[in-house]
């Protein structure tokens, strides 16, 4: 996403702090997101992408309708107190990033919930029509989980 849409140039936050925020957010998200480990997911694409165009659907002789897939906008607000930001600008080791971490975890969980359970306009992996299910056994013994997964996909 471009810095213009993020408003970074208008922000009182310096480049060093933006790098810390970006690095922290990406590290936390990568450690939490499960759906992106199972599927090839793209994004984020920025605020301007609201839908993806699909193939036109013919609804009559010489009549077709453009189909599109609406995209979810997943977000969570958080606050870093101005005094904390000012203290970081003076001494870079003194910033409490827990609000950012909490918000990042919330966004990652929302994304995974959409991937697995879906939403009002799109099914998830566990709720789609025709989804296959398999019974799992007790995974406390080594190798049982692997065996269950192999049996489920073969």
Segments and roles (model prediction):
Residues 1-4, 71-79, 122-129:
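Short, compositionally biased low-complexity segments
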Residues 1-66:
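N-terminal "assembly arms/tails" that initiate or stabilize quaternary assembly
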Residues 2-15, 83-88, 131-141:
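Charged, low-complexity surface segments at secondary-structure and domain boundaries
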Residues 11-14, 22, 43, 53-55, ...:
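Serine/threonine-rich low-complexity intrinsically disordered regions
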Residues 16, 20, 75-80, 94-98, ...:
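Conserved active-site and cofactor/substrate-binding residues in soluble primary-metabolism enzymes
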Residues 28-35, 81, 106, 110-113:
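Generic N-terminal helix/loop capping motif
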Residues 52-96:
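Long, hydrophobic/aromatic-enriched structural stretches that serve as scaffold segments
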Residues 87, 91-98, 102-154:
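Alpha-helical scaffold segments that mediate packing/assembly in large oligomeric complexes
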């Amino acid at each position: 996403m471009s810095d213009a849409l993020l408003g970074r140039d208008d922000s009182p936050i310096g480049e060093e702090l933006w790098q810390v925020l970006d690095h922290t957010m990406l590290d936390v998200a990568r450690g939490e997101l499960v759906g992106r480990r199972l599927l090839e997911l793209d994004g984020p694409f920025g605020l301007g992408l609201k839908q993806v165009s699909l193939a036109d659907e013919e609804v009559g002789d010489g009549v077709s309708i453009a189909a599109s897939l609406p995209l979810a906008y997943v977000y969570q607000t958080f606050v870093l107190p101005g005094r904390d930001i000012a203290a970081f600008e003076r001494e870079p080791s003194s910033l409490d990033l827990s609000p950012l971490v909490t918000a990042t975890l919330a966004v990652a969980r929302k994304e995974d919930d959409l991937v697995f359970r879906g939403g009002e306009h799109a099914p998830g992996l566990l709720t789609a029509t025709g989804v296959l299910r398999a019974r799992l056994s007790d995974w406390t013994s080594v190798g049982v989980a692997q065996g269950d997964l192999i049996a489920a996909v073969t």
